[in-house]
Design a protein with these regions (language model features):
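Glycan-recognition and catalytic cores of secretory/periplasmic carbohydrate-active enzymes
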Residues: 1-276
Length: 276
């Protein structure tokens, strides 16, 4: 209990210093509470990787949907954007200042600790999506809304499909027959999602950030979960006029291309060069 208290206190302290996408630190240091300086050497990827692990432990202790709000943010907007889609190289920091670009690793001239945790991150893309308990009854907590199938037992399989980035919709289909409690997370970015069961719109109550569906399911039953993917601004901590723009859970960025940066793209010592 003593060490658990330390972990919770640490989490609550550093959350007061995170960037809009959940990343932490600049130059591998924490700043004063409530301050996040934008720069080229911010948000070390290893730090974000470990914050996901910490959040996972805390959620297992106390299943609170606000923990998954943070988990989702840092997963989509730091971890998922830390790999070069062309080469598989990983980022060390994620630059937060406008006009800076990412530098990716390679096996010959730029290889750091974040390459190793980065490999593990992309082997755990289902991490945090589902949590299963079977104390009093079989319960599946649906935390993230990415396509994924989970076999709960010999009688029941749950399949999630859809792409919320494209249309804000996710469908959960039941394969098999049996009793199941589904807890669907209500995300902070949409407190009023539309819920349909087998095509019929449902009313619901929200408890601890979740909608509970407790019933006997039949093979082929499906649940449609529809979100309002609206735009919103997130003010930078410690700044009066800097904001991040979000669309649903996704932080938006500007694609500035890579003109005139190819010559240093594999040199991780050149974090300080802005795109011009």
């Amino acid at each position: 209990e003593y060490y658990k208290t330390i972990v919770i206190n640490f989490y609550n302290m550093v959350r007061k210093m995170d960037y809009a996408n959940g990343g932490l630190g600049i130059n591998e240091f924490f700043e004063d509470e409530g301050i996040t300086t934008l720069g080229n050497y911010s948000e070390e990827t290893c730090c974000s990787y470990n914050m996901l692990k910490l959040t996972d432990y805390m959620f297992r202790w106390n299943p609170d949907s606000s923990l998954i709000d943070y988990f989702e943010n840092i997963f989509y907007n730091q971890i998922m954007c830390s790999m070069d889609p062309a080469t598989g190289g990983k980022t060390y920091p994620i630059s937060t200042a406008f006009g800076y670009y990412k530098i990716y690793s390679n096996a010959e001239t730029a290889f750091c600790c974040c390459c190793c945790t980065g490999q593990e991150s992309f082997s755990k893309l289902t991490y945090g999506e589902y949590y299963v308990t079977n104390d009093k009854s079989l319960t599946l907590m649906v935390n993230l809304f990415n396509p994924m199938t989970i076999k709960l037992n010999d009688q029941l399989t749950v399949k999630q499909t859809g792409d919320i980035l494209l249309d804000g919709k996710s469908r959960i289909t039941i394969v098999g027959n049996g009793k199941l409690t589904l807890n669907l997370r209500v995300p902070a970015w949409d407190k009023n999602p539309i819920l349909k069961i087998n095509g019929e719109k449902q009313t619901y109550q929200i408890n601890n950030g979740y909608i509970t569906i407790d019933r006997e399911f039949s093979n082929g039953d499906y649940i449609d979960y529809e979100f309002n993917m609206s735009y919103r601004l997130d003010k930078q901590k410690g700044s009066e006029n800097s904001y991040a723009l979000f669309y649903g859970p996704f932080m938006l960025v500007c694609d500035l291309g890579n003109k005139d940066v190819d010559d240093i793209k594999d040199n991780q010592s050149d974090f300080g060069l802005p795109y011009d």
